[in-house]
Amino acid sequence: MSAAKVLLQNNAFASALRPESARAVTPLLAALVAAKLAIQFAGINQYGFFRDELYYMACGEHLAWGYIDQPPLIALVSWLARHLLGNSMFSIRLFPILAGATVVGLTGMLAWEFGGGKLAQLLGATAVLLAPANLAFDSFLSMNAFEPLFWLLCAWIAVRIVNGASPVLWLAFGVVAGLGLENKHSMLVFGFAFAAGLILSGEGWLFKSKWIWIAAMIALLLFLPNLIWEARHGWPQVEVVRNAQRLKNVSISPLRFLFDQVLFLHPLELPLWLGGLAWCFLTVQGKRFRFLGWAYLIVLFLFISMHGKSYYPLPYYPMLMAAGGVAFERLVSARNRRSLAVAFPLIMVIGGVATIPFGVPVLPVATFLRYSSGLPMFQVRVESDPKVSLPQLYADMFGWKNMANVVSDVYHKIPAGERSRCAILAGNYGEAGAIDYYGPKLGLPKAISGHNSYFDWGPRNYTGECVIIFGDPTEQLTKFFGEVEQVATISNPHAMDVEQNVPVFVCRKPDAPLATIWPHFKMII
């Protein structure tokens, strides 16, 4: 009989694992959550919208059970934010910030479930708070801001069950997993790794519970609408992943993939999460939770073998940080090293604070450029666009409003009789999203584009007799239009290279109606 099964039969022992100081630490965890909120809010309006945020807002105007490149939840969050809180950067970014703050608090709670005291809880939560990648992904509306919350909630529920809570809690696991699938399909990777981890760690007996299978059915039912949408649309996510690996993502070796984990989480936090992994495998106390260690290794292997982006495993690390907090607490307690109990957290905090500007835009651009020149290793690239002056995360926050202004100038110079029939065709969803967000105040119509879900939404009712096109190669335009005139150029010194020196064309005399040539503008990536 496994150790976890024994614990399930002995709730008193499971309760005894929770230290008496657990309640006393709650105000300190709350303080860390407040610190997380303060840091994120400090940079909420410093730069502009991130490229994907503009796209998600456009998706929120076309609510559906699926999109070419994502499940429906992120579009729904965008719609809710704008309708409940207003059409501002603050409203769009509030929910991801709250999700990130919840992950900080939940990490401390998971450390408690692992049997950790004050030090374990605070150390794990602090590590999650200060990890540069967590700060970055929680700074803007993104599926990546919510994914750690879904993974961590599932882990917390599972650990509670292992510690003796009612197996009925598996139903909550199913709900969380189902919602996670509607956020990002990589929840499937977590689910597979979690199940395999239970089997490899000797906890496969948990599958004998009817509740875990009911939970699986709940998750499937919640996922089913998006699954049906995918099937009806020819599984576009498969095409997106295949094209991104071939044309967009940086190709890196497994060694570089692993090295990026260290940078994303901060090198000073490496001993903590590695210690957490070791605690799961090598200690008596961690044996009950070995399934989480196996699941992490499987997640890592799957993403490396699938040539995924190196940040894909990041949602898993709060679990290892919580376990690492317990391992560190046990180490300093067993060896009576109080100085280490102070020194390591202090060094970690100092190092983490030093890298906050790489995750949250708290500094003006000029100041950040000077500051970051001394720490170039933290400017990690995940896409194959040439390097620009700013890290990719920040570069994609510049140029959008200016782009809309330039297009507006061009649009309003079109003769009035022709203007009402003139379409605005953007080369990618960021450009189209910028027109859709800033355009109403500038008197612009909604944009069209062949990129991802914009392609699915079609050319609206435009004939193509007059089209303002930017972000598409000139040779493609001359192939389909008899008259192609460059009338402006869009650029921004801090934007991504792909948004530098973008020509703006007015195209007329199409060879065929726009609906006919529309498939040639398709770009699924």
For every predicted segment, state its role.
Residues 3-4, 16-17, 25-30, 107-130, ...:
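Transmembrane-helix signature of polytopic, membrane-embedded enzymes
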Residues 30, 94-115, 153, 157:
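Transmembrane-helix motifs of polytopic, lipid-linked glycan transferases
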Residues 33, 124-130, 177, 181, ...:
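Short helix- or helix-capping micro-motifs
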Residues 112-115, 154-170, 276-284:
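Membrane-interface transmembrane helices that cradle and orient dolichyl/undecaprenyl
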Residues 133, 139-147:
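Short acidic/glycine- and proline-prone juxtamembrane loop motifs at membrane-interface regions
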Residues 157-178, 209-213, 217, 294:
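Short hydrophobic alpha-helices at membrane interfaces in multi-pass membrane enzymes
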Residues 179, 190-289, 303, 356-362, ...:
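Transmembrane-lumen/periplasm boundary regions of multi-pass, lipid-linked membrane glycan transferases
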Residues 330-371:
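Signature aromatic-anchored transmembrane alpha helix within multi-pass, membrane-resident enzymes
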